[in-house]
A protein has these predicted regions:
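Glycine-rich phosphate-binding active-site loops on the catalytic face of alpha/beta enzymes
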Residues: 108-115, 166-178, 223-242
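Glycine-enriched alpha-helix->loop->beta-strand junction motifs that scaffold or abut catalytic
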Residues: 53-55, 79-81, 100-106, 140, ...
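Hydrophobic faces of well-ordered beta-strands that scaffold small-molecule active sites
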Residues: 19-25, 57-59, 84-86, 106-108, ...
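Conserved N-terminal beta1-alpha1 strand-loop-helix module at the mouth
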Residues: 12-93, 97-103, 184
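Catalytic cores of alpha/beta
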Residues: 92-101, 152-162, 209-224
């Protein structure tokens, strides 16, 4: 075994793969919009969250702009120094927004316009042609693309065939099942992550991940690149402070 092989083996054995924490700031925008004006300022909040150790900022602008407004996206793009991830259903307005703003990553979500929160993943078999066209368009503008998917290893090869770079695994079923049988709850995500990796896809995850269930998920699911967390993290920040909370969530990923 040569020196390079020894170094590679040492690194593999002794250093854990780092999972990125992207903080969804929609809830901060919800508070702002409840009173009008610009308090709290989502731009300042995003800058502070990065300074406190987050690896990225996520937003999900919806057509009714009930939290993040379309105008927030280019403003955030100017100041976010880590990774900027914009989620949403690819309407013509959404596509125009992200093509002009050019975030690092666009996550395609099959939301109805009136959805309170994301509640399902894409059926890539039914929407294959549609997704393939959208992915091609976004990638032609230099953006990484992720598709929001439920945990189903059988669909990962089909997802990869759209040309997407990553999938984001919809983790609500894990969060619901964690308290009853965490091994059973995480099992589909382990197999789906393996299948995604085998298909050449990066793996993100999000929805209802929190301080109670995050560490186990991160320990069990292989090839995990990024988690996106908003509601739980911002809620915890009311008790622990934003800086402490970001660092607490980061520690759960170590």
């Amino acid at each position: 075994m040569n020196l390079n092989s020894n170094i590679a083996e040492f690194c593999t054995t002794n250093f854990k793969y780092m999972i990125a924490l992207s903080v969804n700031i929609n809830k901060i925008a919800t508070i702002r919009n409840a009173r009008g004006g610009n308090t709290p300022d989502v731009i300042v909040a995003a800058q502070n969250i990065e300074r406190f150790g987050a690896d990225g900022i996520t937003v999900h602008p919806r057509p009714d702009e009930r939290h993040i407004r379309y105008a927030d996206v280019p403003a955030l793009k100017k100041v976010v120094k880590t990774e900027f991830n914009v989620e949403g259903y690819p309407t013509s307005d959404f596509m125009e927004l992200v093509i002009q703003s050019k975030p690092n990553q666009v996550t395609l979500v099959p939301d109805a316009p009136d959805a309170i929160t994301s509640n399902a993943g894409w059926d890539v078999e039914t929407h294959f042609d549609f997704l393939s066209g959208i992915v091609k368009e976004l990638k032609s503008h230099g953006m990484r693309v992720s598709i929001f998917m439920e945990a189903n290893p059988a669909l990962m090869a089909k997802a990869a065939a759209t040309g997407t770079d990553r999938v984001e695994l919809y983790t609500e079923s894990y969060a619901v099942g964690y308290s009853f049988d965490k091994e059973k709850a995480v099992a589909p995500f382990i197999e789906t992550a393996k299948a995604a990796h085998s298909a050449g896809l990066g793996v993100n995850a999000g929805h209802d991940l929190n301080m109670a269930n995050l560490k186990y998920f991160a320990q069990q699911v292989p090839h995990l690149d990024e988690v996106s967390i908003g509601h739980a993290l911002i809620s915890d920040a009311l008790y622990f402070g934003l800086e402490n909370t970001v660092q607490m969530y980061k520690n759960e990923l170590m």
